[in-house]
Swiss-Prot record:
Subcellular location: Cytoplasm; Cytoplasm, Cytoskeleton, Cilium axoneme
Name of the featured protein: Cilia- and flagella-associated protein 300
Gene from which the chain derives: cfap300
Major location (coarse): cytoplasm
Domain of life: Eukaryota
Function: Cilium- and flagellum-specific protein that plays a role in axonemal structure organization and motility. May play a role in outer and inner dynein arm assembly.
Length: 267
């Protein structure tokens, strides 16, 4: 959505940062040590903002446009500087946004049971190794990374296309691939546990009063923003491991931002 297609709907949303909000996965020592090992520490963050009007998912373009136009967002939204590698705020005038709604309906980790049943992970939890292959910035040295990265992999279809579009799967994939100098795990446990921790940290659920079933009420968007020079958020350098998700809680009227910029993590 660009300035030329600005909607009056967007004007009604305003945002303010929730500065005292903490996220467990960023403060938990064990999780931080894993993020450091995966070369993501110091390049991944989560932030919280509140908004002041009722939000419906069909308003996603207007909502995200308003988010990136809000001066309180621009002065607080963190990015990793391409020049220094340090945290700075976005601060630039956004001319266009791209918004993709992400499927988010998984209530358990059963999505990953196929890793065991299809021989990608042994019963012990150890990830099966393979001969090294190389794809872009990634070394593929095990069956897990083959399934995640290679479309022509023999076992690619253990995850359906709809599985691969789920926020839970995307989180898992991001953690498995890590940053520029990622040290891969030999076992699947740390990836699954960290995925679950972040997922629960970011999403809100509610019990349906009629069916008594738990359902996710948060809406997830993958976003990017552009200034007069091109893409400026999450970075001016596109990479599949550089990402930003907005997670919207319609009851609390909170927006959580999950951000990562591919590179060498902090030690």
């Amino acid at each position: 959505m660009s300035a030329g297609s600005f909607s009056t709907e967007a004007a009604k949303f305003s945002f303010s940062p929730i500065l005292n909000k903490t996220f467990g996965f960023l403060t938990n020592r064990d999780t931080r040590e894993l993020l450091m090992k995966w070369s993501m520490n110091g390049r991944i963050t989560a932030q919280a903002f509140r908004y002041d009007e009722c939000f419906q998912p069909y308003q996603k373009n207007d909502f995200v446009w308003a988010f990136f136009q809000d001066p309180d967002v621009l002065s607080h939204l963190k990015i990793v500087s391409e020049n220094s590698g340090q945290w700075v705020t976005l601060g630039t005038k956004v001319k266009k946004v791209d918004v993709q709604e992400i499927l988010c309906s998984q209530l358990s980790m059963s999505l990953f049971d196929c890793l065991y049943s299809e021989g990608i992970v042994r019963e012990s939890g150890h990830i099966c190794k393979c001969l090294d292959e190389y794809l872009d910035d990634f070394t593929i040295s095990d069956e897990l990374r083959k399934v995640l990265l290679l479309d022509d992999c023999e076992k690619h279809d253990v995850f359906s296309q709809s599985d691969r579009e789920q926020f839970l799967f995307l989180l898992f994939k991001h953690l498995c691939l890590g940053g520029a100098i990622c040290q891969f795990e030999d076992t699947i446990g740390p990836y699954l546990e960290t995925t679950k921790s972040i997922y629960k940290d970011l999403l809100s659920v509610q019990k349906d009063p009629e069916t008594k079933q738990i359902r996710i009420i948060s809406t997830v968007f993958k976003v990017s923003a552009y200034d007069e020079n091109g893409m400026c958020y999450p970075s001016g350098r596109p990479h599949q491991q550089t990402f930003a998700y907005l997670i919207v809680d319609p009851l609390k009227r909170h927006v959580y931002v999950l951000y990562h910029c591919f590179g060498g993590g902090a030690f």
